Amino acid sequence: MKKEFAVIGLGRFGGSICKALSEEGVEVMAMDIDEDKVNEYAKIASHAVIGDSTDESVLKNLGLRNFDHVIVAIGENIQASILTTLILKELGVHTITVKAQNDYHEKVLSKIGADHIVHPERDMAKRIAHNIVSNNVLDYLELSEEHSLVEIVANSRLAGNTLLDLDIRAKYGINIVAIKRGKEVIVSPLATEVIHQEDILIVIGSVTDISRFEKRVLHTK
C-alpha cells in the first residue's frame, strides 16, 4: 500500500515538495486557501483541494488523520502555520513536517510537537556558502547545529592511501561512511580500501572537525 502525503501551502517550497513527491509516485494531496494555486497543482497532485487549514472541521472532513505524513508549508502566516500544526497533532497525524520562518517560529513548533522542522532558505544558504568556500566539497547537509554530512572529492593528497593510512577518524574525529566511485557506491568501506583520485567521500562529523579536515587536507581557506 502506497504511503499517503499531504502538502498544506502551495507556495514555492510547498509546490516544490508536492512536485517532488508526485514524481516519486506516491499519493499526494495538495491543499491551499488560494484557488489559483490549487488549480495550478490539480494535474500534479493526486488530489488538490481549496481549504482553510486553520479550520479543524475542514481537516477532519479531508481525513488528514489517515495520512502517513503531512507537510505544513504555509508561507508568511506564522499564526496559521502554528494553528494548523496544533490541529494536526490533535488529530493524531503520524508525522508532521513544518516549514519555519524564523528561530522563534521554530521554538514554538518544537514545543507543540512538530516532528520535523525545516528552514529551506537558511539551510540552502548554508549549503551554497559552504560549496563556494570549499572547492572540493560537492554537497553539504546540516544534520544538527553541530554535525554535518558532506560529499568531498578526493584530491591527490588522499589518493593512493588506504583509510587505515589516513587514520582520519583518529586525527580529525570524522568518519568516511561511504565512497562513490563512478556508478559504484561502497558503503561502510573497510580500513584496507584504497582511495582513488576523484572518488567522492561521504563524510560525517562535527562542523568544526570537518572544517579542520578541509583546511589541512584539502587546502581550503
UniProtKB/Swiss-Prot annotation:
SUPFAM superfamilies: NAD(P)-binding Rossmann-fold domains, TrkA C-terminal domain-like. Homodimer, tetramer (dimer of homodimer) and octamer (tetramer of homodimer). Part of the KtrCD complex formed by an octameric catalytic ring of KtrC and a membrane associated dimer of KtrD forming a potassium channel. GO terms for molecular function: monoatomic cation transmembrane transporter activity. It is found in: Cell membrane. Disruption phenotype: Impaired potassium uptake. Pfam families: TrkA_C, TrkA_N. Keywords: Cell membrane, Ion transport, Membrane, NAD, Potassium, Potassium transport, Transport. Its main location: membrane. It comes from Bacillus subtilis (strain 168). GO terms for biological process: potassium ion transport. PROSITE patterns: RCK_C, RCK_N. The keyword Ligase does not apply. The keyword NAD applies. One of its GO terms (cellular component) is plasma membrane. PANTHER family: KTR SYSTEM POTASSIUM UPTAKE PROTEIN C (PTHR43833:SF7), POTASSIUM CHANNEL PROTEIN 2-RELATED-RELATED (PTHR43833). InterPro entries: NAD(P)-bd_dom_sf, RCK_C, RCK_C_sf, RCK_N, Trk_Ktr_HKT_K-transport. It comes from the Bacteria. It is a peripheral membrane protein. This is Ktr system potassium uptake protein C. Residues 135-219 form the RCK C-terminal domain. Residues 2-118 form the RCK N-terminal domain. Catalytic subunit of the KtrCD potassium uptake transporter. The 2 major potassium transporter complexes KtrAB and KtrCD confer resistance to both suddenly imposed and prolonged osmotic stress. NAD(+) binds at R12, D32, I33, D34, D52, S53, I74, G75, E76, K99, A100, Q101, H105, E121. Belongs to the KtrA potassium transport family.
